[in-house]
Regions:
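Mid-chain, well-packed structural core segment of small domains
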Residues: 1-38
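Flexible glycine-rich active-site/ligand-binding loops centered on an Asp-His dyad
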Residues: 17, 36-74
């Protein structure tokens, strides 16, 4: 059993699809902490989140120069 100790990220759009970029830290029963990018997870009981909604849409585009999907704020 793990407990989420931190979850932070953003939700944007890429090619009209929802794009989640999230970092997670979680601890085990021995108090070891693990972290990294959240790709998939299943919540067995509860997970309390605060989501701040901004006006407009934030899109991502692939940047060939650095090889990452970056915000396009234009």
């Amino acid at each position: 059993m793990f407990e989420i100790t931190s979850l932070l990220g953003n939700i944007s759009r890429k090619d009209s699809d929802v794009y989640l970029h999230a970092h997670i830290n979680f601890s085990d029963e021995s108090l070891n902490v693990y972290g990294g990018h959240l790709v998939k997870c299943y919540i067995s009981a509860t997970c309390e989140l605060v989501v701040t909604v901004l006006n407009g849409t934030i899109n991502r585009e692939f940047n060939e120069e650095i090889g990452l999907n970056l915000f396009n704020l234009n």
